[in-house]
Amino acid sequence: MSALLEVEDLEVSFGRTGAVRGASLKVERGETLCVVGESGCGKSVTSLAVMNLLARGARRTATRMSFEGQDLLRLSDAGMSKLRGNDMAMIFQEPMTSLNPAYTVGSQMTEVLRRHKGASQRVATDRAADLLARVGITAPGLRLGQFPH
């Protein structure tokens, strides 16, 4: 059985600036990996590279990058989109950039539920409101219609 996630010799650069050089990791099923390092050392860039969410113009290479045996280096954008949010996710460091200010909180939360869980708009909206209430956000129905800022 292959590892859940395997990355071998990851290199990421932005133009001529190297951001990650030779990163390798292996995560087996049931394991948790904690990546610790100084600010700017490449922790987030490594995660973004695995998720194929790097900014346009970034260059990503690796000897091997697989998730559940699937070659992430050869997977199409549509294939990566199916994995992200359902099978593979990232908790972003900066909460102010986790939600896009151009879209309502509700549209961003329900998109995930509709795309990955096949929920109807009504079911997704009810679930999103429930999730907001569970974490202590007041007036969740109202908040779903607001823009993050």
Language model segments and positions:
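ABC transporter nucleotide-binding domains
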Residues: 1-149
